[in-house]
């Protein structure tokens, strides 16, 4: 008799995705981050569900309800900080996951890559609307500033902003709908994750060598289930150190002040994981130009499958592109730092240079390096 997991219609799907899945035998720990993102997503949905049981999406009580969760609900402080810092862990894993995709040339699996970009954007939208919910000063002003950017769209901009706000300013209607969006978006993310996996399992995983691995595959379970479990334990350890010892280190002190439309904080800035995009937005003096640059800072990732002309897969044996890649990562860190600084000299200039570098590396320098490396290969072979 055949094993049930191989014949049962439902178990068969799980079996082919997580148990008997043929996996390259040489994938390194950089491939752990996909499963870590899955763990983060499940954790965010569960903690979010329990928070939603006690949260009220009304401007008069939202701030108090979050304080009530932290003070009066059993382990409410733990759930709240796991949710807030879990979002940071989610984005750390996502940045590493995308960075690994660029380094090892995973973008050649273009369907998986493009669904990944949509996932990235959807997760950013989820985090943005979630940041508004505690209704602190930074929540309110962050929502005002970012939604106001849509007014740069010609002709329909102002109407669009008022439509999103549900009035003439960020108010009760805005908070209620943002809560609704924040509740539904993670489930849309989950659906997209399944599509992401569907496309990935059509082609199979990439591997560090960049070579075809069909001749050397091993079952996912037990080898990679154990390997992923180690990653999960490390992730939870880092998360719990954050939650239990430094719960507010990644947050903004201004968000402990209730939202006040009459008092603007000195420096309006989003959560740390948006700072690189925020720096790119601010580096362009024109409003519409800034908005376009902000959107393009993520959509530019979709160019990787199109502009890749290298004869080799990944950057393992490509020292010139490797060098450019690490400059790109350093530049991204500079942008993140600039995004959190006030708009004054020299930060504005550094931000503008870094923004130009960000796009130039992807669109100009990497393709040139590809061509040089292809020519070097021709000389040898």
UniProtKB/Swiss-Prot annotation:
Any single Pfam family the record assigns to this protein: Cytochrome_B
Binding site for a ubiquinone: 201
Amino-acid positions noted as binding heme b b566 in the UniProt annotation, renumbered to this chain: 97, 196
GO cellular component: mitochondrial inner membrane; respiratory chain complex III
Cofactors demanded by this protein: heme b
InterPro entries: Cyt_b/b6_C (IPR005798), Cyt_b/b6_C_sf (IPR036150), Cyt_b/b6_N (IPR005797), Cytb/b6-like_sf (IPR027387), Cytochrome_b (IPR030689), Cytochrome_b_C_euk/bac (IPR048260), Cytochrome_b_N_euk/bac (IPR048259), Di-haem_cyt_TM (IPR016174)
Superkingdom, natural source: Eukaryota
Membrane topology per record: Multi-pass membrane protein
GO function terms (MF aspect): metal ion binding; ubiquinol-cytochrome-c reductase activity
Transmembrane domains' residue ranges: 33-53, 77-98, 113-133, 178-198, 226-246, 288-308, 320-340, 347-367
Keyword check for Flavoprotein: no
Primary site of residence: mitochondrion
Residues reported to bind heme b b562: 83, 182
Cellular localisation: Mitochondrion inner membrane
Keywords on record: Electron transport, Heme, Iron, Membrane, Metal-binding, Mitochondrion, Mitochondrion inner membrane, Respiratory chain, Transmembrane, Transmembrane helix, Transport, Ubiquinone
Any GO BP annotation: mitochondrial electron transport, ubiquinol to cytochrome c
CDD domains according to UniProt: cytochrome_b_C, Cytochrome_b_N
Family: Belongs to the cytochrome b family.
General remark: Heme 1 (or BL or b562) is low-potential and absorbs at about 562 nm, and heme 2 (or BH or b566) is high-potential and absorbs at about 566 nm.
Subunit description: The cytochrome bc1 complex contains 11 subunits: 3 respiratory subunits (MT-CYB, CYC1 and UQCRFS1), 2 core proteins (UQCRC1 and UQCRC2) and 6 low-molecular weight proteins (UQCRH/QCR6, UQCRB/QCR7, UQCRQ/QCR8, UQCR10/QCR9, UQCR11/QCR10 and a cleavage product of UQCRFS1). This cytochrome bc1 complex then forms a dimer.
Functional description taken from the UniProt entry: Component of the ubiquinol-cytochrome c reductase complex (complex III or cytochrome b-c1 complex) that is part of the mitochondrial respiratory chain. The b-c1 complex mediates electron transfer from ubiquinol to cytochrome c. Contributes to the generation of a proton gradient across the mitochondrial membrane that is then used for ATP synthesis.
Protein name: Cytochrome b
Phylogenetic lineage: Eukaryota, Metazoa, Chordata, Craniata, Vertebrata
């Amino acid at each position: 008799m055949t094993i049930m997991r191989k014949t049962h219609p439902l178990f068969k799907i799980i079996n082919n995705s997580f148990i008997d899945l043929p996996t390259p035998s040489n994938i390194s720990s950089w491939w752990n981050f996909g499963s870590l993102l899955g763990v983060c997503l499940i954790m965010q949905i569960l903690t979010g569900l329990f928070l939603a049981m006690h949260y009220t999406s009304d401007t008069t009580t939202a701030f108090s309800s979050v304080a009530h969760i932290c003070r009066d609900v059993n382990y409410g402080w733990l759930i709240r900080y796991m949710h807030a810092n879990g979002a940071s862990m989610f984005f750390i894993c996502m940045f590493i996951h995308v960075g690994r995709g660029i380094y090892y040339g995973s973008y050649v699996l273009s369907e998986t890559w493009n669904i990944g970009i949509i996932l990235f954007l959807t997760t950013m939208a989820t985090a943005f609307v979630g940041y508004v919910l505690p209704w602190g000063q930074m929540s309110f002003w962050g929502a005002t500033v970012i939604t106001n950017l849509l007014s740069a769209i010609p002709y329909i901009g102002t109407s669009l902003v008022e439509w999103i706000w549900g009035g003439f300013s960020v108010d009760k209607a805005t908070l209620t709908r943002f809560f609704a969006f924040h509740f539904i978006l993670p489930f849309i993310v989950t659906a997209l994750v399944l599509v992401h996996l569907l496309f990935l399992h059509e082609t199979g995983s990439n591997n560090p060598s960049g070579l075809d691995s069909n001749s050397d595959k091993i079952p996912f379970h037990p080898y990679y289930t154990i390997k992923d479990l180690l990653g999960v334990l490390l992730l939870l350890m880092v998360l719990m150190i954050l939650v239990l010892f430094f719960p507010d280190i990644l947050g903004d002190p201004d968000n402990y002040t209730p939202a006040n439309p009459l008092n603007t904080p000195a420096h309006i800035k989003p959560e740390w994981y948006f700072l690189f995009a925020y720096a790119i937005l601010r580096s362009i003096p024109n409003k519409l130009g800034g908005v376009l640059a902000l959107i393009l800072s993520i959509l530019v990732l979709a160019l990787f499958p199109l502009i890749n002309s290298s004869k080799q897969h990944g950057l393992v044996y490509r020292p010139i592109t490797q060098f450019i890649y690490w400059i790109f990562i350093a530049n991204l860190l500079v942008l993140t730092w600039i995004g959190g600084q006030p708009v004054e000299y020299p930060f504005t200039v550094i931000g503008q240079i870094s923004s130009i570098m960000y796009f130039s590396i992807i669109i100009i320098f990497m393709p040139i390096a590809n061509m040089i490396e292809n020519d070097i290969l021709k000389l040898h072979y």
